[in-house]
């Protein structure tokens, strides 16, 4: 990673095994958080309290209460904090949303969103020694301690409630955010969901198949369909919002 960045900017960046060291560096203005989900809110709050602005990878937090704490921290320390739903920054998407808000198709009241994939089974992990390159104590951070298993790092932590938030907040958050933006809504008044782990019998805990319905005060509705292990497309696309 360091070598790749050096080639892009012709300057070798500093590296530290612990992000908290960067918070003490006066030359650092912004912390970009791309850690596992359970670290998102704590890292963002620490950064704000250290006087740093934050670009925070989705999801904002591991649970709703942490998200509220992040918002309060940004306000308290007067820091700029942006959550990484990057489509908000795409000019073509912003232009389309502006057209939608201007009434190009009338008043929209329903948005359908989805994400599909063909993820493989993660198997049943075995407790093993922590790899020499991994500071597992720091990786676990604020989470209660659990033994290291060989099917956890780098990506499969997404599917464990202890560290991750499942496909809904791994990918669903992108499409639902676009739908909220397009419908010009904020918090839902009613949420319902059903789903489960159906495709494989393994250590994966979060749903691999899920439906979420969100209703809003202005009589509008958003649905999200997630299928982590069945990549059959919807509307000829593996991911989308209409």
Give each language-model segment a name.
Residues 53-55, 60-140:
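A contiguous active-site-proximal alpha/beta segment in oxidoreductase catalytic domains
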Residues 7-10, 34-38, 61-65, 84-87, ...:
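Alpha-helix capping and helix-loop boundary segments enriched in small/acidic/polar residues
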Residues 41, 45, 68, 90-94, ...:
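A structural signal for well-ordered alpha-helical segments within the folded catalytic domains
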Residues 1-56, 65-80:
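N-terminal glycine-/serine-/threonine-rich beta1-alpha1-beta2 phosphate-ribose binding loop
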Residues 95, 107, 112, 118-165, ...:
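Contiguous beta-strand/loop segments that form the cofactor/metal-binding neighborhood of enzyme cores
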Residues 11, 27, 104-107, 187:
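Short loop/turn motifs at secondary-structure junctions
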Residues 26, 32-35, 100, 115, ...:
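Sec/Tat-exported extracytoplasmic proteins
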Residues 14-16, 82, 192, 223:
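General small-molecule cofactor/ligand-binding pocket signal
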